[in-house]
Amino acid sequence: MFLAQEIIRKKRNAEVLSTEEIQFFVNGITNNTVSEGQIAALGMAVYFNDMNMDERIALTTSMRDSGTVLDWKSLDLNGPIIDKHSTGGVGDVISLMLGPMAAACGGYVPMISGRGLGHTGGTLDKFDAIPGYNTEPDSALFRKVVKEAGVAIIGQTGDLVPADKRFYSIRDNTATVESISLITASILSKKLAAGLDALAMDVKVGTGAFMPTYEASEELARSITAVANGAGTKTTALLTDMNQVLASCAGNAVEVKEAVDFMTGAYRNPRLYEVTMGLCAEMLTLGGIASNEAEARAKLNEVLDNGKAAEIFGRMVSGLGGPTDFVENYSKYLPDSQIIRPVYAEQTGFATAMDTRELGLAVVTLGGGRRKPGDTLDYSVGLTKVCALGDEVSADKPIAFIHAQSEGAFAEAEAAVKKAIHIGDTKPEKTPEIYRYIRESDL
Protein backbone atom coordinates (compact mmCIF):
# COMPACT_ATOMS: atom_id res chain seq x y z
CA MET A 1 0.00 0.00 0.00
CA PHE A 2 1.36 3.41 -0.99
CA LEU A 3 0.48 6.94 0.06
CA ALA A 4 0.16 9.59 -2.65
CA GLN A 5 1.87 12.21 -0.47
CA GLU A 6 4.88 9.93 0.07
CA ILE A 7 5.24 9.42 -3.69
CA ILE A 8 5.11 13.22 -4.13
CA ARG A 9 7.70 13.64 -1.36
CA LYS A 10 10.09 11.19 -3.05
CA LYS A 11 9.93 13.02 -6.36
CA ARG A 12 10.16 16.40 -4.59
CA ASN A 13 13.44 15.13 -3.12
CA ALA A 14 14.63 14.05 -6.60
CA GLU A 15 14.43 10.33 -5.81
CA VAL A 16 13.53 7.66 -8.37
CA LEU A 17 9.97 6.30 -8.23
CA SER A 18 9.36 2.57 -8.61
CA THR A 19 7.08 1.20 -11.32
CA GLU A 20 4.62 0.13 -8.59
CA GLU A 21 4.52 3.64 -7.09
CA ILE A 22 3.86 5.17 -10.50
CA GLN A 23 1.12 2.60 -11.25
CA PHE A 24 -0.52 3.35 -7.88
CA PHE A 25 -0.52 7.10 -8.53
CA VAL A 26 -1.89 6.75 -12.08
CA ASN A 27 -4.66 4.46 -10.80
CA GLY A 28 -5.48 7.20 -8.30
CA ILE A 29 -5.68 9.78 -11.09
CA THR A 30 -8.12 7.53 -12.97
CA ASN A 31 -10.39 6.58 -10.06
CA ASN A 32 -10.24 9.99 -8.33
CA THR A 33 -8.59 8.72 -5.13
CA VAL A 34 -5.74 11.18 -5.79
CA SER A 35 -6.76 14.83 -5.48
CA GLU A 36 -6.19 17.62 -8.00
CA GLY A 37 -3.73 19.22 -5.59
CA GLN A 38 -1.72 16.00 -5.35
CA ILE A 39 -1.65 15.59 -9.14
CA ALA A 40 -0.51 19.21 -9.52
CA ALA A 41 2.18 18.69 -6.87
CA LEU A 42 3.57 15.58 -8.56
CA GLY A 43 3.51 17.37 -11.92
CA MET A 44 5.57 20.24 -10.50
CA ALA A 45 7.98 17.84 -8.76
CA VAL A 46 8.54 16.03 -12.08
CA TYR A 47 8.90 19.37 -13.89
CA PHE A 48 11.79 20.37 -11.59
CA ASN A 49 13.40 16.98 -10.88
CA ASP A 50 12.54 15.05 -14.05
CA MET A 51 12.17 11.30 -14.51
CA ASN A 52 14.67 8.76 -15.80
CA MET A 53 13.76 6.54 -18.78
CA ASP A 54 12.47 3.68 -16.62
CA GLU A 55 10.14 6.08 -14.80
CA ARG A 56 8.96 7.55 -18.12
CA ILE A 57 8.23 4.06 -19.49
CA ALA A 58 6.30 3.17 -16.31
CA LEU A 59 4.29 6.42 -16.47
CA THR A 60 3.52 5.93 -20.17
CA THR A 61 2.42 2.29 -19.86
CA SER A 62 0.40 2.96 -16.67
CA MET A 63 -1.45 5.80 -18.42
CA ARG A 64 -1.90 3.69 -21.57
CA ASP A 65 -3.44 0.92 -19.46
CA SER A 66 -5.72 3.31 -17.51
CA GLY A 67 -8.45 2.68 -20.09
CA THR A 68 -9.16 0.47 -23.08
CA VAL A 69 -6.16 -0.67 -25.13
CA LEU A 70 -7.29 -1.57 -28.64
CA ASP A 71 -6.64 -5.15 -29.73
CA TRP A 72 -6.79 -6.00 -33.43
CA LYS A 73 -6.08 -9.76 -33.26
CA SER A 74 -9.75 -10.75 -33.66
CA LEU A 75 -9.92 -9.01 -37.06
CA ASP A 76 -7.24 -11.30 -38.58
CA LEU A 77 -5.58 -8.40 -40.38
CA ASN A 78 -2.90 -9.40 -42.88
CA GLY A 79 -0.55 -6.52 -42.17
CA PRO A 80 1.02 -4.50 -39.34
CA ILE A 81 -0.80 -1.86 -37.26
CA ILE A 82 1.19 1.33 -37.99
CA ASP A 83 0.71 5.03 -37.32
CA LYS A 84 2.40 8.40 -37.03
CA HIS A 85 2.05 11.31 -34.66
CA SER A 86 3.05 14.94 -35.10
CA THR A 87 3.79 17.52 -32.42
CA GLY A 88 1.74 19.91 -34.56
CA GLY A 89 2.40 22.73 -36.94
CA VAL A 90 0.88 25.02 -39.55
CA GLY A 91 -0.23 23.57 -42.88
CA ASP A 92 0.63 20.11 -41.52
CA VAL A 93 -1.82 18.07 -43.57
CA ILE A 94 0.39 14.94 -43.69
CA SER A 95 -2.00 12.56 -41.88
CA LEU A 96 -4.63 12.89 -44.62
CA MET A 97 -2.28 11.47 -47.26
CA LEU A 98 -0.01 9.31 -45.11
CA GLY A 99 -2.80 7.12 -43.67
CA PRO A 100 -4.23 6.10 -47.07
CA MET A 101 -0.71 5.77 -48.58
CA ALA A 102 0.39 3.37 -45.82
CA ALA A 103 -2.88 1.42 -46.09
CA ALA A 104 -2.47 1.14 -49.87
CA CYS A 105 0.92 -0.52 -49.24
CA GLY A 106 -0.57 -3.15 -46.91
CA GLY A 107 -0.52 -1.51 -43.49
CA TYR A 108 -3.46 -0.84 -41.17
CA VAL A 109 -3.69 2.67 -39.74
CA PRO A 110 -6.12 3.25 -36.82
CA MET A 111 -5.23 6.92 -36.39
CA ILE A 112 -6.61 8.64 -33.30
CA SER A 113 -6.16 12.37 -33.80
CA GLY A 114 -6.86 15.64 -32.06
CA ARG A 115 -8.37 19.06 -32.66
CA GLY A 116 -6.41 22.26 -33.12
CA LEU A 117 -5.57 24.57 -30.24
CA GLY A 118 -3.42 27.67 -30.29
CA HIS A 119 -1.63 28.25 -33.59
CA THR A 120 -1.56 24.61 -34.71
CA GLY A 121 -4.24 23.03 -36.87
CA GLY A 122 -6.01 19.83 -35.84
CA THR A 123 -6.50 16.81 -38.10
CA LEU A 124 -10.06 16.28 -36.85
CA ASP A 125 -11.01 19.86 -37.72
CA LYS A 126 -10.00 19.21 -41.31
CA PHE A 127 -12.26 16.14 -41.47
CA ASP A 128 -15.11 18.09 -39.87
CA ALA A 129 -15.05 20.24 -43.03
CA ILE A 130 -16.25 17.15 -44.97
CA PRO A 131 -20.07 16.87 -44.78
CA GLY A 132 -21.23 13.71 -43.02
CA TYR A 133 -17.76 12.49 -41.96
CA ASN A 134 -18.08 11.06 -38.45
CA THR A 135 -14.97 11.70 -36.35
CA GLU A 136 -16.56 9.97 -33.34
CA PRO A 137 -17.83 6.59 -34.58
CA ASP A 138 -18.58 3.73 -32.21
CA SER A 139 -15.96 1.02 -31.79
CA ALA A 140 -17.68 -1.37 -34.22
CA LEU A 141 -17.70 1.15 -37.09
CA PHE A 142 -14.10 2.23 -36.36
CA ARG A 143 -12.92 -1.39 -36.55
CA LYS A 144 -15.01 -2.07 -39.68
CA VAL A 145 -13.48 0.88 -41.56
CA VAL A 146 -9.94 -0.03 -40.44
CA LYS A 147 -10.47 -3.59 -41.73
CA GLU A 148 -12.18 -2.64 -45.01
CA ALA A 149 -10.35 0.57 -46.00
CA GLY A 150 -7.10 -0.07 -44.12
CA VAL A 151 -7.27 3.34 -42.43
CA ALA A 152 -9.67 5.29 -40.22
CA ILE A 153 -8.87 8.72 -38.81
CA ILE A 154 -11.05 9.54 -35.80
CA GLY A 155 -11.05 11.38 -32.45
CA GLN A 156 -10.13 10.08 -29.02
CA THR A 157 -12.94 8.06 -27.47
CA GLY A 158 -13.89 8.43 -23.83
CA ASP A 159 -12.59 5.02 -22.80
CA LEU A 160 -9.03 5.59 -24.07
CA VAL A 161 -6.42 6.91 -21.61
CA PRO A 162 -8.69 8.57 -19.02
CA ALA A 163 -5.64 9.23 -16.78
CA ASP A 164 -4.11 11.51 -19.42
CA LYS A 165 -7.29 13.56 -19.81
CA ARG A 166 -7.34 14.41 -16.11
CA PHE A 167 -3.56 14.84 -15.74
CA TYR A 168 -3.27 17.04 -18.84
CA SER A 169 -6.04 19.45 -17.83
CA ILE A 170 -4.36 19.95 -14.44
CA ARG A 171 -0.91 20.41 -16.04
CA ASP A 172 -2.42 23.00 -18.38
CA ASN A 173 -3.70 25.00 -15.40
CA THR A 174 -0.55 24.68 -13.26
CA ALA A 175 2.24 25.54 -15.76
CA THR A 176 3.76 22.07 -16.08
CA VAL A 177 2.90 21.36 -19.73
CA GLU A 178 6.53 21.87 -20.84
CA SER A 179 8.06 18.90 -18.97
CA ILE A 180 9.66 16.53 -21.53
CA SER A 181 8.89 13.51 -19.31
CA LEU A 182 5.22 14.44 -19.02
CA ILE A 183 4.89 15.39 -22.72
CA THR A 184 6.40 12.01 -23.66
CA ALA A 185 3.95 10.07 -21.47
CA SER A 186 0.96 12.13 -22.63
CA ILE A 187 1.70 11.67 -26.36
CA LEU A 188 2.69 8.01 -26.19
CA SER A 189 0.00 6.78 -23.79
CA LYS A 190 -2.63 7.95 -26.30
CA LYS A 191 -0.82 6.54 -29.33
CA LEU A 192 0.11 3.19 -27.78
CA ALA A 193 -3.48 2.66 -26.57
CA ALA A 194 -4.31 2.18 -30.27
CA GLY A 195 -2.50 -1.18 -30.16
CA LEU A 196 0.29 -0.24 -32.57
CA ASP A 197 3.11 -2.43 -33.88
CA ALA A 198 5.10 0.57 -35.10
CA LEU A 199 5.05 4.37 -34.90
CA ALA A 200 6.78 7.18 -36.79
CA MET A 201 7.00 10.34 -34.72
CA ASP A 202 7.16 13.77 -36.40
CA VAL A 203 8.81 16.28 -34.05
CA LYS A 204 8.68 19.78 -35.52
CA VAL A 205 11.54 22.27 -35.32
CA GLY A 206 11.36 26.03 -35.91
CA THR A 207 9.13 29.09 -35.64
CA GLY A 208 5.89 27.11 -35.86
CA ALA A 209 6.95 24.25 -33.59
CA PHE A 210 5.62 23.34 -30.15
CA MET A 211 9.14 23.08 -28.70
CA PRO A 212 10.97 26.42 -28.55
CA THR A 213 14.44 25.34 -29.78
CA TYR A 214 16.09 22.68 -31.95
CA GLU A 215 17.77 21.27 -28.83
CA ALA A 216 14.43 20.92 -27.00
CA SER A 217 12.85 19.27 -30.06
CA GLU A 218 15.74 16.79 -30.26
CA GLU A 219 15.48 16.03 -26.54
CA LEU A 220 11.76 15.29 -26.95
CA ALA A 221 12.42 13.13 -30.04
CA ARG A 222 15.04 11.09 -28.15
CA SER A 223 12.72 10.67 -25.16
CA ILE A 224 9.81 9.49 -27.33
CA THR A 225 11.99 7.03 -29.27
CA ALA A 226 13.48 5.55 -26.08
CA VAL A 227 10.19 5.31 -24.18
CA ALA A 228 8.08 3.93 -27.05
CA ASN A 229 10.65 1.24 -27.87
CA GLY A 230 10.99 0.53 -24.14
CA ALA A 231 7.21 0.06 -23.99
CA GLY A 232 7.37 -2.47 -26.83
CA THR A 233 6.39 -0.42 -29.91
CA LYS A 234 8.99 0.00 -32.68
CA THR A 235 9.40 3.76 -33.06
CA THR A 236 11.55 6.25 -34.94
CA ALA A 237 11.35 10.03 -34.53
CA LEU A 238 12.02 12.47 -37.38
CA LEU A 239 13.02 16.07 -36.72
CA THR A 240 11.27 18.07 -39.45
CA ASP A 241 11.24 21.73 -40.42
CA MET A 242 8.46 24.10 -39.31
CA ASN A 243 10.21 27.39 -40.12
CA GLN A 244 7.60 27.88 -42.83
CA VAL A 245 4.10 26.63 -43.58
CA LEU A 246 4.45 22.97 -44.58
CA ALA A 247 1.75 22.75 -47.26
CA SER A 248 0.95 25.65 -49.61
CA CYS A 249 -1.99 26.53 -47.39
CA ALA A 250 -3.27 26.67 -43.81
CA GLY A 251 -6.86 26.20 -42.68
CA ASN A 252 -9.36 23.37 -42.78
CA ALA A 253 -11.23 22.96 -46.09
CA VAL A 254 -8.25 24.44 -47.97
CA GLU A 255 -5.95 21.78 -46.50
CA VAL A 256 -8.39 18.99 -47.38
CA LYS A 257 -8.35 20.25 -50.99
CA GLU A 258 -4.54 20.22 -51.05
CA ALA A 259 -4.46 16.70 -49.57
CA VAL A 260 -6.81 15.34 -52.25
CA ASP A 261 -4.84 17.14 -54.99
CA PHE A 262 -1.67 15.54 -53.56
CA MET A 263 -3.14 12.03 -53.74
CA THR A 264 -4.63 12.45 -57.23
CA GLY A 265 -1.42 14.06 -58.52
CA ALA A 266 -3.09 17.37 -59.41
CA TYR A 267 -0.53 19.23 -57.25
CA ARG A 268 2.22 18.03 -54.92
CA ASN A 269 4.04 20.63 -52.86
CA PRO A 270 7.68 19.42 -52.88
CA ARG A 271 8.31 20.12 -49.17
CA LEU A 272 5.09 18.38 -48.14
CA TYR A 273 6.03 15.44 -50.39
CA GLU A 274 9.47 15.03 -48.76
CA VAL A 275 8.20 14.99 -45.17
CA THR A 276 5.22 12.76 -45.99
CA MET A 277 7.45 10.27 -47.81
CA GLY A 278 10.06 10.29 -45.03
CA LEU A 279 7.50 9.50 -42.31
CA CYS A 280 5.50 7.02 -44.36
CA ALA A 281 8.60 5.13 -45.55
CA GLU A 282 9.73 4.81 -41.92
CA MET A 283 6.32 3.36 -40.99
CA LEU A 284 6.61 0.76 -43.76
CA THR A 285 10.15 -0.29 -42.80
CA LEU A 286 9.37 -0.44 -39.05
CA GLY A 287 6.24 -2.45 -39.84
CA GLY A 288 8.14 -4.92 -42.03
CA ILE A 289 6.27 -4.01 -45.24
CA ALA A 290 9.53 -2.83 -46.82
CA SER A 291 13.09 -3.91 -46.04
CA ASN A 292 14.65 -0.46 -46.53
CA GLU A 293 13.79 3.16 -47.29
CA ALA A 294 14.35 2.88 -51.06
CA GLU A 295 11.92 -0.04 -51.33
CA ALA A 296 9.39 1.78 -49.13
CA ARG A 297 9.57 4.94 -51.27
CA ALA A 298 9.10 2.91 -54.45
CA LYS A 299 5.94 1.31 -53.01
CA LEU A 300 4.62 4.71 -51.88
CA ASN A 301 5.24 6.36 -55.24
CA GLU A 302 3.46 3.46 -56.92
CA VAL A 303 0.26 3.83 -54.82
CA LEU A 304 0.28 7.58 -55.44
CA ASP A 305 0.77 7.19 -59.19
CA ASN A 306 -1.74 4.38 -59.73
CA GLY A 307 -4.48 6.13 -57.73
CA LYS A 308 -4.73 3.49 -55.00
CA ALA A 309 -4.00 5.94 -52.15
CA ALA A 310 -6.69 8.36 -53.40
CA GLU A 311 -9.15 5.47 -53.76
CA ILE A 312 -8.52 4.36 -50.16
CA PHE A 313 -8.99 7.93 -48.90
CA GLY A 314 -12.36 7.97 -50.67
CA ARG A 315 -13.27 4.60 -49.14
CA MET A 316 -12.43 5.87 -45.65
CA VAL A 317 -14.47 9.07 -46.14
CA SER A 318 -17.56 7.19 -47.37
CA GLY A 319 -17.10 4.46 -44.74
CA LEU A 320 -17.28 7.10 -42.00
CA GLY A 321 -20.38 8.78 -43.44
CA GLY A 322 -18.97 11.25 -45.97
CA PRO A 323 -19.90 11.54 -49.66
CA THR A 324 -19.13 8.52 -51.87
CA ASP A 325 -17.78 10.76 -54.66
CA PHE A 326 -15.76 13.08 -52.45
CA VAL A 327 -12.36 12.57 -54.13
CA GLU A 328 -13.78 13.24 -57.59
CA ASN A 329 -16.02 16.17 -56.59
CA TYR A 330 -14.56 17.70 -53.42
CA SER A 331 -15.23 21.28 -54.56
CA LYS A 332 -18.96 20.46 -54.53
CA TYR A 333 -18.80 19.55 -50.83
CA LEU A 334 -16.19 21.82 -49.21
CA PRO A 335 -17.21 25.35 -48.16
CA ASP A 336 -15.78 28.50 -49.78
CA SER A 337 -15.35 31.81 -47.96
CA GLN A 338 -17.00 35.08 -49.06
CA ILE A 339 -13.69 36.81 -49.81
CA ILE A 340 -10.65 35.25 -51.53
CA ARG A 341 -8.01 37.88 -52.28
CA PRO A 342 -4.22 38.12 -52.62
CA VAL A 343 -1.79 39.80 -50.23
CA TYR A 344 1.22 41.55 -51.74
CA ALA A 345 4.61 42.31 -50.23
CA GLU A 346 5.47 45.94 -49.54
CA GLN A 347 8.75 45.57 -51.44
CA THR A 348 10.45 43.50 -54.13
CA GLY A 349 12.85 40.81 -52.92
CA PHE A 350 12.89 37.29 -51.52
CA ALA A 351 10.94 35.63 -48.72
CA THR A 352 13.81 35.29 -46.23
CA ALA A 353 12.07 34.21 -43.02
CA MET A 354 8.63 33.30 -41.76
CA ASP A 355 7.06 33.53 -38.33
CA THR A 356 5.03 30.37 -38.86
CA ARG A 357 3.33 30.62 -35.48
CA GLU A 358 1.96 34.07 -36.40
CA LEU A 359 0.60 32.69 -39.69
CA GLY A 360 -1.17 29.97 -37.70
CA LEU A 361 -2.63 32.62 -35.41
CA ALA A 362 -3.81 34.58 -38.48
CA VAL A 363 -5.94 31.53 -39.38
CA VAL A 364 -7.32 31.58 -35.82
CA THR A 365 -8.30 35.27 -36.13
CA LEU A 366 -10.09 34.47 -39.41
CA GLY A 367 -12.19 31.93 -37.48
CA GLY A 368 -10.39 28.78 -38.63
CA GLY A 369 -8.86 27.93 -35.25
CA ARG A 370 -9.76 28.00 -31.56
CA ARG A 371 -9.02 30.68 -29.01
CA LYS A 372 -10.32 28.30 -26.33
CA PRO A 373 -11.53 24.67 -26.31
CA GLY A 374 -15.10 24.33 -27.53
CA ASP A 375 -15.01 27.27 -29.96
CA THR A 376 -16.90 26.62 -33.20
CA LEU A 377 -14.87 26.94 -36.39
CA ASP A 378 -15.44 28.38 -39.84
CA TYR A 379 -14.06 25.61 -42.07
CA SER A 380 -13.91 27.79 -45.20
CA VAL A 381 -11.33 30.35 -44.06
CA GLY A 382 -7.54 30.25 -44.18
CA LEU A 383 -4.50 30.99 -46.31
CA THR A 384 -3.62 29.51 -49.71
CA LYS A 385 -0.71 29.79 -52.16
CA VAL A 386 1.56 30.87 -49.30
CA CYS A 387 5.01 31.65 -50.70
CA ALA A 388 7.95 29.45 -49.71
CA LEU A 389 11.22 30.70 -48.26
CA GLY A 390 13.46 31.74 -51.14
CA ASP A 391 10.56 32.68 -53.43
CA GLU A 392 10.85 35.99 -55.27
CA VAL A 393 8.06 38.42 -54.36
CA SER A 394 7.04 41.87 -55.59
CA ALA A 395 4.20 44.36 -55.57
CA ASP A 396 2.45 42.32 -58.27
CA LYS A 397 3.38 38.81 -57.07
CA PRO A 398 1.28 37.70 -54.04
CA ILE A 399 2.85 36.28 -50.88
CA ALA A 400 -0.45 34.52 -50.06
CA PHE A 401 -4.19 34.49 -50.68
CA ILE A 402 -6.52 35.11 -47.75
CA HIS A 403 -9.90 33.35 -47.50
CA ALA A 404 -12.06 35.47 -45.18
CA GLN A 405 -15.74 36.04 -44.39
CA SER A 406 -15.60 39.83 -43.85
CA GLU A 407 -13.56 42.86 -44.88
CA GLY A 408 -12.56 43.40 -41.25
CA ALA A 409 -11.28 39.85 -40.88
CA PHE A 410 -9.43 40.14 -44.21
CA ALA A 411 -7.70 43.38 -43.15
CA GLU A 412 -6.61 41.91 -39.80
CA ALA A 413 -5.22 38.77 -41.46
CA GLU A 414 -3.52 40.81 -44.21
CA ALA A 415 -1.60 42.83 -41.62
CA ALA A 416 -0.61 39.64 -39.77
CA VAL A 417 0.59 37.90 -42.96
CA LYS A 418 2.67 40.90 -44.06
CA LYS A 419 4.27 41.08 -40.63
CA ALA A 420 4.95 37.32 -40.47
CA ILE A 421 6.65 36.95 -43.86
CA HIS A 422 9.97 38.78 -43.94
CA ILE A 423 11.24 40.13 -47.27
CA GLY A 424 14.94 40.75 -47.93
CA ASP A 425 17.33 41.43 -50.81
CA THR A 426 19.30 38.19 -50.57
CA LYS A 427 17.87 34.78 -51.37
CA PRO A 428 18.24 32.57 -48.26
CA GLU A 429 19.95 29.18 -48.36
CA LYS A 430 17.58 26.24 -48.67
CA THR A 431 16.98 24.41 -45.39
CA PRO A 432 16.33 20.65 -45.24
CA GLU A 433 12.77 19.36 -44.80
CA ILE A 434 14.04 16.56 -42.54
CA TYR A 435 16.94 17.44 -40.20
CA ARG A 436 17.56 13.95 -38.88
CA TYR A 437 16.14 10.55 -37.96
CA ILE A 438 16.41 9.33 -34.36
CA ARG A 439 16.13 5.54 -34.34
CA GLU A 440 16.47 3.17 -31.40
CA SER A 441 20.01 2.38 -32.59
CA ASP A 442 20.95 6.09 -32.24
CA LEU A 443 20.19 6.27 -28.52
UniProtKB/Swiss-Prot annotation:
Transmembrane regions listed in the UniProt entry: none
UniProt lists the gene as: deoA
Please report the organism this UniProt entry assigns to the protein.
Shewanella piezotolerans (strain WP3 / JCM 13877)
Which Gene3D superfamilies does the entry mention? Nucleoside phosphorylase/phosphoribosyltransferase catalytic domain, Pyrimidine nucleoside phosphorylase-like, C-terminal domain, Transferase, Pyrimidine Nucleoside Phosphorylase, Chain C
Q: Answer whether the UniProt record assigns the keyword Transferase to this protein.
A: yes
Protein's job: The enzymes which catalyze the reversible phosphorolysis of pyrimidine nucleosides are involved in the degradation of these compounds and in their utilization as carbon and energy sources, or in the rescue of pyrimidine bases for nucleotide synthesis.
Extract one GO BP annotation from the record: thymidine metabolic process
Is this entry keyworded Glycosyltransferase? Answer: yes
Name of protein: Thymidine phosphorylase
